[in-house]
Amino acid sequence: MCGFVGFVGGTDNQSEVLTKMMDRIVHRGPDMGGQFIDGRVALGFRRLSILDLTEAGAQPMANEDGSVVIVFNGEIYNFQELRSELEAKGYKFHCGADTESLLHGYEEWGEAVLDRLRGMYAFVIWDKKKNKLFGARDIFGIKPLYYYPMADAGDGAPGVLFGSEIKSFLDYPHFHKAVNKKALRPYMTLQYSATEETFFEGVYKLPPAHYFTVDIPTGKMNIERYWDCDYSAVEKPFEEYVDELDEVVHESVEAHRIADVKVASFLSGGVDSSYIAACLMPDKTFSVGFDYKNFNETNYAKELSDKLGVENVRKMITADEFFGALDDIQYHMDEPQSNLSSVPLWFLAEMARKDVTVVLSGEGADELFGGYAYYEDTVPVRKYKKMVPLPIRRALGNLALHMPYFKGHNFLVKGAEIPEKSFLGQALVWPEREVDGVLKPEYNTGDGAFELAAPIYARVKGQPELVKKQYLDMNMWLPGDILLKADKMCMAHSLELRVPFLDRKVMEFAEHIPDRYRINENGNKQVLRHAANKSLPDEWATRPKVGFPVPIVYWLREQKWYDYVKEYFTAPWASEFFDTDELMHLLDLHFAGKGDFQRKIYTPLVFLVWYKRFFIDEDQSSVQAA
C-alpha cells in the first residue's frame, strides 16, 4: 500500500515540486519515498512497506533497461502465479514485491495484463519507447486514482497531473484551484461526490474497471472500460451455492492475508465483518462505538471475539472527538462526504494502526449478495405486486411520476418495478425536488442524481429489478462512498485496509447466484448468511446489518453543537452556496425537537467544513508561508 503522484509538464524545479506533492501524501507511505524524472515525465512515490520490506521493493520501479517505469498503489493477490508464468518466459525478478510482477506483466501482455490481475490497484506506467502513460484502476474502485489534464503544463505544451489524492495537485504551480459548480447538486441528494469530475474543477476520478492512455507529445487521453459484471443466473441447488460460497470466501481471505507484517480485522458484530474475522482468525479485532446511551454495539464484537478466542480492542467515541475530527477528515477525504460512518472509521483506523499495518474488513458483501434493506419490498408493496398485474402497476407508476408529489407517490412508483425512476441507492438526503429550494442557482446547474444514474441503468437494461439495483450500487454507492472513505480514512493513519468480499473470484461466483437465493421471504443475503453459519454461531449468521450508528440526532439538540453548526451556516461565505436562512430554519426545528433533520443538516455542514479547509484555511496558510 502506498500513494503516488506524478505529472507530465515543463514546470521549473521539477524535483522540488514533486517533493512537495509527495509530502502532501506522506501519510499514505511514511516508510520511504522515491522519485523518477525523465524530461517532462515525473513520478513520485510514498511507501508503506507490507510485502518485501527491503529497499529492493521500492518505487518508482523500472525494468532492466529503464524503458518502463511504474508507480503502483495496492496489492496483487495472484502476483506469485504471474511471476511464475513470467519467469518461464525469461523475465528476471529482483525482489519479492508484487510491483515487479505487474511491471513485467505489462511488458509481456501490454494493456491486456489487466485481464489477469486479481487485487486492488491503481497504477501509472511510463512507457518510454511508446512515449505514453498507461494507468488503471481495479474493477471495484477500491484504490483511488485522480487526474487533471492541462492544456498548458507550464512549458506551452499539454500535460497532466495524476495521483492517489487530489490534495497533492495543490502544490503544482500550474494547477488552478476552483470549486466545480456542477458537483454540489447531486451531492446534496447522495451525500458523496457522484460525478467523474470531482469537487475540484477540472480534476477527474478514473472510474473503476477503466484504464487510460496519454500520448505525451499531443497530450491526448483515451479512457476505456476493461471489465464489467456479467449477471446471468445459473441454476443449481441452494445448498450447493452455500457450500461453494463458503469455499470461495475462505480462499479469498487466505489470499488477502498475504503480508510480511501483522494482519488483523475490523469487527462490527454484523454478519459480514464477523464472517471475515472467523475465516481469518487474527490475533486481534478492532471495534468502535459511541459514548452515548444505546449507540454502543461493541459488546457484540467483544462477545464474538471471545467465542473465537481473539482479543478485541475497543474505543468509545465522544461528541467532542466526533466534531473535533471533522476538519481533518474532510481534508483527507479530498471531497465532501457526509456519510456519518466516516468519523467512527477514522477513529477505528487510528486505533488499529497502533498495533498492526493491515486489516481486513467486510465491505462489499451487501452489494454483491443483496444485503441492503432497500433491496427488499415492504409488506404492503409485496401484497400490491401479488394483487395487481405488472402492466397496471407500470401504468400507475408512470402516471405518478408525471404528477406533483403526493402521499402514496413512492408506493406506486416502487410497485411499478422501474428502479430507473425510483431507486438511487442507500443515501437519499435531500430529495431532488427539494434541492432547488436550498442551493443558490449558480450551484444548482449540475446533473441530478437520476440523470447520473441513467447511463448506468442503461448497461443492465432488461435485467431483473434486483440486479439493476445492485448494479447501480456497484457503480455509484460502492466506489463513491463506501470504498473511498475506507481507503482515505485508513490511509490517513498509514493503515492498509483489504476487502476479501470484493475479489475477482468472489464476484465471478456471486454474479451467477439466482435472485431468489439472494433475497426471499426469509430475508436478505440468504446464500451468504447460510455460508457464514458454517463458521459462526447461529445468532451471528442471522444478525441484522450493524454498521456505525451515530447519535448525531441527539447531539444537534445540545447547545454546544447547535452553536458549532450555526457558526458554519451563518458564515458570510456560506451564502455563496446555500439559502442559509433555510438551513438555519431546519437547524432550529431540529434543535427544538420539531423534526429529525440530522442528515439534511450534516450534509451541507460537511461541504462547508471541506470548503473552509481547502479554500479559506489553505489559502491563508499559503499567504502566510509566502
Regions found by a protein language model. Name each.
Residues 347-403, 464, 477, 483-506:
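Active-site adenylate/phosphate-handling loop in enzymes that bind or generate adenylated species
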Residues 1-4, 20, 157, 171, ...:
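Adenosyl-5′-phosphate
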Residues 1-333, 345, 349, 534, ...:
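Cysteine-centered catalytic environments shared across enzyme families
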Residues 132-133, 143-144, 170, 367-371, ...:
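Short catalytic/ligand-binding loop motif for oxyanion handling, primarily in non-cytosolic enzymes
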Residues 71-72, 183, 244, 339-343, ...:
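A conserved catalytic-core signature of glycosyltransferases
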Residues 90-93, 335, 589-594:
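A short glycine/serine-rich beta->alpha loop
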Residues 327-331, 353, 375-377, 555-557:
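Short low-complexity, flexible loop/linker segments enriched in glycine and/or proline
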